[in-house]
Amino acid sequence: GVARTRAVETLPVHARMIDGLAARTGLDRDREVLPHPAEIDELVAVGHGLASPELAVLLAHTKLGIKAAVLRTDLPERPEFADRLPGYFPRALRERIPAAVAAHPLRREIVTTMLVNEVVDRAGITFVHRLGEDTGVGADDAVRAFRVAVTVFDLPALWARVAALPGTVPTAAADAIAV
């Protein structure tokens, strides 16, 4: 995917993210098989980025960190995100028991997971981190900013057009359009 394609150019950001996760969440580089600073220096020297398994670990920890930060806020209860919860459940349940769906005991966690997945899957592993570095906003405000951009620029329509491109479009070109 895009993260793998851009792994070399985003290695400095990935390194800062790993450092931040280690400091804030106790991420264990050895247990997670993530490179230490000296190993990152070696990757830079030879022009490599993180490998796919390392990116997968970074992706998982990034999503967990954003989710934890968002759950500490009122964002999952905000009216602008109310449409997320029903979409998680099959249509039959939404139609048959809408009140039970709306009152689901894990609704905050479900909404948060859906929001975090959309942000990271669409904007990339580094989006929330870079926005925080550049502007000082927290993860919840980064999620809000993403939703505003999605709405203002009608990004779902663009994503649908990219998805509809013929299979003959090179992956790198489709990735560049998606980013």
Give residue spans per PLM region:
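Ligand/cofactor-recognition surfaces for anionic moieties
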Residues: 1-179
